[in-house]
Regions:
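Conserved acidic segment of CheY-like receiver
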Residues: 5-15, 20-24
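Acidic di-acidic motifs
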Residues: 10-13, 38, 68
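Alpha4 helix (beta4-alpha4-beta5 surface) of REC/receiver domains from two-component response regulators
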Residues: 21-22, 78, 90-97, 103-120, ...
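Helix N-cap/capping motif at the beta->alpha junctions
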Residues: 35-49, 76
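Active-site beta3 strand of CheY-like receiver
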Residues: 50, 54-66
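Conserved phosphotransfer cores of two-component systems
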Residues: 57-60, 84-92
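Receiver (REC) domain active-site loop signature in two-component systems and cognate sites
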Residues: 71
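C-terminal output helix
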Residues: 124-137
């Protein structure tokens, strides 16, 4: 699988972030894997990306976002609503995949109804999950 430039993990759970970061690094999925521990931190990161020079060493525009649904203060749905409303002139939106332990049918139905959401996967990431995401959404990256 070919590397993406940047993957953003948005999750408040440190063990999950540790595992997902480890797996993405081990599988050589991206040049940069960035962790945001809250929706607010992720929005701040995107604002910095928009303000940073194109070749910034600190902020890398994500190609893929793995987003937790259940987080305190700002859940994944609230983050996504604010993310979609950011000023996108000259910038491309990242592919968003929810990573969750939620078994609520409402979450699956909402994810399927939103064109901004590319999928909903169970936590934690696995090599098979990554392979499926690459086959579906990044076929140019064999």
């Amino acid at each position: 699988m070919k590397k993406l430039r940047c993957i953003l993990l948005i999750d408040d759970d440190e063990p999950t972030n540790f595992w997902n970061h480890f797996l993405l690094t081990k599988q050589n999925c991206a040049e940069h894997v960035v962790i945001a521990k809250s929706g607010r931190e992720a929005l701040d990161y995107h604002r910095h990306c928009m303000e940073a020079p194109v070749q910034s060493e600190l902020y890398h525009w994500p190609d893929l976002i793995f987003l937790d649904i259940n987080m305190p203060r700002m859940n994944g749905w609230e983050f996504l609503e604010k993310y979609i409303s950011l000023p996108w002139e000259g910038h491309r939106k990242a592919l968003v995949v929810f990573l969750t332990t939620s078994l609520f049918p409402e979450d699956l139905a909402m994810a399927e109804a939103m064109p901004e959401v590319a999928g909903l996967e169970n936590k934690p990431l696995t090599p098979a999950t990554l392979e499926n995401i690459w086959k579906l959404h990044f076929p140019e990256y064999p």
